[in-house]
């Protein structure tokens, strides 16, 4: 895929940068792998906002993605590469030789007609899924399980990848996109290669309206609010807020670490950079 720019026929087009999706399927999603998706507007079951700046946006259907890749040693053919509104990566529709169809995250370099398989001792090629113990050192991987059989949980965003660094007994060391080096059990599964749609990060929406189409509401600065709404609100003219940057609830922000210690910290060999 390539990047597309536009002539400045309007202020919104002037800075817009989008991705050419010539290789994506023109048809709709596979109906058997689609379910409804209701919007929350950022509210919980009490109707209170628990996640700000969420609301509106185009109606979506959820595509059921196979993160477990538990259909072992059965060849599948890539039938289509499709757009998925629920994630940054594109998805690939697989058709297995027994007739079943499943969606997976589309890896970089995989195209329509390619063969993909999951198993314990399959070839090391993009899209194939196998246990970390059977993947050679230095291999680029994505879609990694954190618990055996639970399904992939990390390295799933567009263009991301991790690298297998070492093997120590029952564990392997993997360097994640954040720079963190972490232990995973050797039987946890991962997919070979990098997640596709690398150009996603180069996009520029060009106007506020396109952000609203994605279900994002305005992110208002605290210093632009009144004192009743934010600790940094109020003041005469354009004041600086009068204190160190903080959240609406008074917690320091812009670099202040809020992560609590947890039992899984023992698997972190090197903290993220």
UniProtKB/Swiss-Prot annotation:
Record keywords, A-Z: Ribonucleoprotein, Ribosomal protein, RNA-binding, rRNA-binding
Disulfide cysteine pairs (residue numbers): none
Residues covered by region (Disordered): 222-273
Any one Gene Ontology molecular-function term assigned to this protein's record: structural constituent of ribosome
Single Gene Ontology BP annotation: cytoplasmic translation
Pfam families: Ribosomal_L2 (PF00181), Ribosomal_L2_C (PF03947)
Presence of keyword rRNA-binding: yes
Gene3D superfamilies assigned to the protein according to its UniProt record, in alphabetical order: 2.30.30.30, Nucleic acid-binding proteins (2.40.50.140), Ribosomal protein L2, domain 3 (4.10.950.10)
UniProt GO cellular component terms: large ribosomal subunit
Compositional bias segments (type: Basic and acidic residues): 262-273
Keyword RNA-binding: yes
Its job: One of the primary rRNA binding proteins. Required for association of the 30S and 50S subunits to form the 70S ribosome, for tRNA binding and peptide bond formation. It has been suggested to have peptidyltransferase activity; this is somewhat controversial. Makes several contacts with the 16S rRNA in the 70S ribosome.
Family, similarity comment: Belongs to the universal ribosomal protein uL2 family.
Assembly information from the UniProt record: Part of the 50S ribosomal subunit. Forms a bridge to the 30S subunit in the 70S ribosome.
NCBIfam families: rplB_bact
Protein name: Large ribosomal subunit protein uL2
Species, as recorded: Desulfotalea psychrophila (strain LSv54 / DSM 12343)
